[in-house]
């Protein structure tokens, strides 16, 4: 334990000791080893972070949009220069393969920051004439202090998705990463400070969501909460935010997304998409297409194509560059996923491949679960209805496309959906009927900075990324001007 680094909170541009006296450990899920000990924030520390953010936000908002953009662009450059260093830390903390974190997590996070750095100068109001002697104009003003609460599956990417539009609009952010993957948020805070962000504009507090999250959502000074996580927790955050000071919220929550493969689909392409939609990042992606609908007559050929591809997955040490499938994020999460797999077996689904914990050699030390494909699934099965957040695909057959659409929509979730077909007209007709916020045709999973991300139904409120997100980090002030005489009715 003497070699394990102790991490403090990051408040007002520097590391500072928490006052709670409590700590928690970050565990490498590939080995079970403790890699860091993190101090947990107290309510006193949250107050200090809010006070710091309020002070820093005034300095930040007073800068011109060009100045803010310049500082954020510097941060982008530093992120890209340190891509591999950050990716190695992310892999250590999350268990995700370095081949993934080095090409996706930091890269796409930096892309979003660069996108909003460019949009910082485009935040503007409008002027509208009312009559010859009067007009009104609007100002887009920052909210002030906002809070971001991150999830454990894309720690630094989520921190950037939340902080980039907030900072571009002139706000300060207090960010709480998941206690399961707490480390790269510290590095992002350091990078922001190095780039020239004023002290307090990006603070990092650590600890359990049920405590820290509640203090943030109920704080009177905090004007907005952006949360990524599970549906039930999201409902509590939203209720708390509404019950305190009626804060604005953005919620990116869970999913159980359908992937519909049409009669005319190229099965090789369909199998490629289905495997990527289920096993990328070891299946720990909110938008995963875990309900795969296939026409009955194509079932056997599709299953064979999927199994062939799953056999090519390279599970192993996530730090090795040839590994493309690492452990799950934690041992408790592994047990949860294994319990879902057991449920699938008990309810009569057939395991085509996988279905167990991976225990060969050094894999036994980590939270590894075999990529698992179930077939002969039914809509009422637990593995089909509930979000597993692991490497578990469920194959379901259908007779008509109308049936597939109806069943695809028969869920409380509505995060993502996809269609594979060679008939582009049919693709659009199907997509327009699917109740989901993020949809893909003949592909899966890409989320460019320009594309809004968010769900329907219980999968979320509001959007992240895209131009419109900036509107939710500002508020509009309307000002009428009268140039002529003023006539009172009294």
Curated annotation (Swiss-Prot):
SUPFAM superfamilies listed in its UniProt record: ALDH-like
**Reaction(s) this enzyme catalyzes, per UniProt:** betaine aldehyde + NAD(+) + H2O = glycine betaine + NADH + 2 H(+)
Quote the pathway field. Amine and polyamine biosynthesis; betaine biosynthesis via choline pathway; betaine from betaine aldehyde: step 1/1
Residue numbers binding NAD(+): 150-152, 176-179, 230-233, 254, 286, 387
Under Pfam families, the record lists: Aldedh (PF00171)
The residues listed in the UniProt record as binding K(+) 2, with positions renumbered to this chain, are: 246, 457, 460
Cofactor binding description: Binds 2 potassium ions per subunit.
InterPro entries (UniProt xref): Ald_DH/histidinol_DH, Ald_DH_C, Ald_DH_CS_CYS, Ald_DH_CS_GLU, Ald_DH_N, Aldehyde_DH_dom, BADH
Q: How does it assemble?
A: Dimer of dimers.
Know the name of this protein? Betaine aldehyde dehydrogenase
Q: Which organism is it from?
A: Acinetobacter baylyi (strain ATCC 33305 / BD413 / ADP1)
